[in-house]
């Protein structure tokens, strides 16, 4: 009877820790996932980190976090690794790679959009375009880099 009680307490503690640590993951919000899918459809996706590689490295203590650039998490989660690491680290490292790719894609899209708009403005200033052509091309550029 005492053995069953200890087993039940251990199982409950493990379940509680697993559920509590789910909040430590670095997932994208639903809106960000939609944006990333749209960028991918438009061919603008930047793959800074491989999601598969991050997941595989997540099996090893801290490796997935180091790969995705989360060095502090890589070090601070080492004490937890023997207990719960193999359960959540591969998933969290993969989600972290997706997050990294999302922000890299967003930055690259903004940078390219700004560059193209600057070039367009220079063409207007040099009288190579009429104001109407400028507006039309500006809308085309904005639609190209929009995440909707």
Please name every model-derived segment.
Residues 1-26:
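Sec-dependent bacterial lipoprotein signal peptides
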Residues 2-3, 7, 29, 35, ...:
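Helical anchoring/docking segments at protein termini
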Residues 12, 52-56, 74-78:
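Hydrophobic alpha-helical transmembrane segments
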Residues 40-49, 59-73:
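Membrane interfacial helix-start motif at the N-side
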Residues 19, 23-54, 79-148:
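Transmembrane helix recognition focused on a "late"/terminal membrane span
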Residues 13-16, 58, 121:
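Short, functionally important structural connectors and interaction interfaces within domains
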């Amino acid at each position: 009877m005492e053995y069953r009680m200890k087993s039940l307490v251990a199982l409950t503690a493990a379940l509680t820790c697993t559920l509590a640590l789910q909040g430590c993951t670095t997932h994208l919000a639903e809106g960000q996932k939609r944006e990333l899918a749209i960028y991918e459809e438009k061919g603008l996706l930047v793959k800074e980190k491989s999601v598969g590689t991050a997941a595989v490295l997540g099996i090893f203590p801290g490796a997935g976090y180091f790969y995705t650039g989360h060095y502090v998490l890589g070090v601070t989660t080492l004490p937890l690794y023997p207990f719960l690491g193999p359960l959540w680290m591969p998933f969290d490292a993969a989600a972290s790679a997706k997050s990294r790719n999302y922000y890299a894609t967003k930055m690259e899209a903004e940078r390219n959009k700004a560059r193209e708009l600057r070039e367009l403005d220079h063409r207007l200033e040099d009288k190579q375009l009429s104001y109407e052509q400028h507006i039309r091309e500006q809308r085309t550029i904005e639609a190209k880099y929009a995440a909707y």
